[in-house]
Amino acid sequence: MAAAESPTSVRKVVVHLRATGDAPILKQSKFKIAGTDKFAKVIDFLRRQLHRESLFVYVNSAFSPNPDELVIDLYNNFGFDGKLVVNYACSMAWG
């Protein structure tokens, strides 16, 4: 019998960060983040790592999510192969 997740346990989401265009490539591209965290935390992390204030961030090379979105919601709707793919660029890459 499988044990149910307790409400206090936090599900971790694997976020795969992929450089797009002229953006520098990170040494470590995969990270785990709590699903209850907002997407703004991913954006802030990238800004600190890249030392840039201006940054364009997309999910699955398709759209830029609202920073208030929960990471777990993005993963449940757009994640695949056990991870959420996040593309980042220093200039606008997709409309």
From Swiss-Prot:
Keyword Amino-acid biosynthesis: no
Key words, A-Z: Autophagy, Cytoplasm, Isopeptide bond, Protein transport, Transport, Ubl conjugation pathway
Subcellular location field: Cytoplasm
Sequence intervals crossing the membrane: none
SUPFAM superfamilies: Ubiquitin-like
Pfam families on file: APG12 (PF04110)
One GO cellular component, as annotated: cytoplasm
Main location: cytoplasm
Positions of crosslink type Glycyl lysine isopeptide (Gly-Lys) (interchain with K-? in ATG5): 95
Top-level taxonomic group: Eukaryota
Entry-linked Gene3D superfamilies: Phosphatidylinositol 3-kinase Catalytic Subunit, Chain A, domain 1
Example GO BP: autophagosome assembly
Annotated family: Belongs to the ATG12 family.
Function as written in the Swiss-Prot or TrEMBL entry: Ubiquitin-like protein involved in cytoplasm to vacuole transport (Cvt) and autophagy vesicles formation. Conjugation with ATG5 through a ubiquitin-like conjugating system is essential for its function. ATG12/ATG5 conjugate has an essential role in plant nutrient recycling.
PANTHER family: AUTOPHAGY PROTEIN 12, UBIQUITIN-LIKE PROTEIN ATG12
The protein, known as: Ubiquitin-like protein ATG12
Organism, as annotated: Medicago truncatula
Gene that produces this protein: ATG12
